[in-house]
């Protein structure tokens, strides 16, 4: 998608008095030469697949390595006891992030948003709102266009792959996309969307990609939780009027620079971090 900067989206939205999400929608229509209805239907299909990835979770399923599975169900059982620190929405955000991340590790269908390793973040923040009746499907679709626009800009200006820029490029980008989507859902203006995305990305900048045994399981699944809850907090800050002191495009650019400076061992090679611990090495040998 030819969106080179968040500033470009801001200017297009301001010049025509349209929301952020509509700029992204119209860009998709122009690029793919499709109607608004056709673009919406493709996004609706992605949303339905995302929703299915959350609701079809099987708590008794385990990944082939045995490292992942069941934690989404554990979180829901714990939440049912009404002893959590977080409220009902955040409880379900955590459980959904775990569930979708585990489903990916168990080879079930997910939506890469922007990658499979970060597949739990967007559904974690959006599916509970939809299930609680706090957002309609049409509002969710609009929020997904907002998320897509942010992801497109990050992909153009930096990177979205752990092998290129570490986990900051995957979970960090997903968190920025989710923060922007949530801000959009509550009527945030383009500038607030930008602040939410910038804060979310800054909070996870420098995060390395260090999968145990090279599998998208440990620590990947639980990092989806961090990305999701980070997105919620950044959306609330932006909607409250809290601003990122560094403009969002500059934050994206420096994330790309941090990724390029990151040692090879910390970019999805499983040669550092938890992957290089005695336990991590033992898992690799066993596999």
Specify the residue positions occupied by each region the protein language model found:
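Generic N-terminal targeting/processing segments that precede catalytic cores or assembly contacts
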Residues: 1-108, 131-132, 241, 248-287
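Alpha-helix capping and helix-loop boundary segments enriched in small/acidic/polar residues
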Residues: 84, 113-116, 138, 162-170, ...
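Glycine- and small hydrophobic-enriched segments that form the cores of compact globular domains
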Residues: 85, 112-119, 131, 153
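Helix-rich "cap/lid" substructures immediately adjacent to catalytic or cofactor-binding pockets
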Residues: 90-105, 128-157
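Conserved phosphate/anionic-ligand binding catalytic regions in large, soluble enzymes, centered on
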Residues: 107-125, 169-174
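Alpha-helical support elements that line or immediately flank enzyme active sites
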Residues: 123-134, 179-187
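A structural-propensity feature for long, helix-poor, extended segments
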Residues: 145-181, 203-230
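Functionally critical mobile loop/hinge segments
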Residues: 184-287
